[in-house]
Structures are given as structure tokens and as C-alpha cells.
């Protein structure tokens, strides 16, 4: 079976890997402006607790470097920034330009871009050297990644 013939799940559909990437992009383009509100409503706000709970286990300290993959609008990045402090660095990546645009606007309004960088990048092929970060996180974005093994390697 060739790469083009390989089928993956997208909701209740079976689609090609390329088609899934395109469809996921279209979904997030269409919801980016309301993404934060949508997360709050769909999870009854519990996603905020889950993110805080996860970050209790990062081991991050002042001055460290963190990477958040599939960052969306940057909620997790703000919490990571609190852990690494002003002398640390947080890099947020997302494949979707609309989500990064919303995140950048929100973070700029909150005054949170000091030691934070946003980069459009595919989680399956990140442009970073190995062992460059003290901590790497990914929240709910993992469910939308086509090749999870590539993203997690």
C-alpha cells in the first residue's frame, strides 16, 4: 500500500493522510476566532484544570526553555511562561496560521510575548535539534495529528 492509498480516520470518515491534514486545517481556520470560547463551553471549563494539572509535572524552573506543540491560541504557553519566568523561553508551534494569529493577538493584548516565540510548524516535522528543550508539551492537538508516531519522536 502506498502512502497515497493509506487511509486514516477523520471523525467518522476514512480519508487519505493528505486529505485529513487539509480537513483539520479547514476546521481550525473556521473556528479560530471562537476557539477559546468553544473550548470553555465544550469542556465546561475543565480544560483549564487539565492544563494546570499537567504543568504541575513539567519540572520546569526559572530560566528553562519550553516548547508547546499544536499550541492553538497559546493557553498552555502562558502557563509555561509562568514556570520559566522572564529569564526562560517558551516557543509555541502550530501548523495553522489562523490559530497562531489569534494566539499572537491574545498574547500581545495580555502583554505575554516578552520571552515567547510563535512559529508555524508541522508537529510531524519540527525544525528543532534534539534535546533543545527542557520540556515539550502538547495538549489536545495530538488528536488532530495524522502521524502521531512522527510527532512524538
Named regions from a protein language model:
Residues 63, 133-134, 148:
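Local beta-strand N-terminus motif with an aromatic residue
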Residues 124-135:
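A short acidic, Gly/Pro-enriched loop at the edge of an enzyme's catalytic core
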Residues 35, 136-137:
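Hydrophobic beta-strand segment of the Class I
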Residues 145-153:
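A short, conserved alpha-helix within the catalytic core of class I
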Residues 140-141:
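Short catalytic micro-motifs in class I SAM-dependent methyltransferases
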Residues 1-25:
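N-terminal auxiliary segments of SAM/dcSAM-dependent transferases
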Residues 34, 44-64, 79:
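Conserved alpha-helix/loop element of class I SAM-dependent methyltransferases that forms part
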Residues 65-125:
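Class I SAM-dependent methyltransferase SAM/SAH-binding core
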Amino acid at each position: 500500500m502506498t502512502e497515497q492509498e493509506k487511509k486514516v480516520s477523520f471523525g467518522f470518515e476514512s480519508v487519505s493522510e493528505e486529505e485529513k491534514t487539509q480537513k483539520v486545517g479547514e476546521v481550525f481556520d473556521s473556528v479560530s476566532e471562537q476557539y477559546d470560547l468553544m473550548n470553555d463551553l465544550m469542556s465546561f471549563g475543565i480544560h483549564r484544570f487539565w492544563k494546570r494539572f499537567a504543568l504541575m509535572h513539567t519540572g520546569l524552573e526559572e530560566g528553562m526553555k519550553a516548547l508547546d506543540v499544536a499550541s492553538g491560541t497559546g493557553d498552555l504557553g502562558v502557563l509555561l511562561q509562568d514556570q520559566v519566568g522572564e529569564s526562560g523561553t517558551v516557543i509555541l508551534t502550530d501548523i495553522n496560521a489562523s490559530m497562531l494569529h489569534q494566539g499572537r493577538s491574545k498574547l500581545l493584548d495580555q502583554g505575554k510575548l516578552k520571552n515567547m516565540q510563535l512559529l508555524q510548524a508541522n508537529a510531524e516535522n519540527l525544525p528543532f535539534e534534539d534535546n533543545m528543550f527542557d520540556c515539550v508539551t502538547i495538549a489536545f492537538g495530538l488528536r488532530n495529528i495524522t502521524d502521531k508516531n512522527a510527532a512524538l519522536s
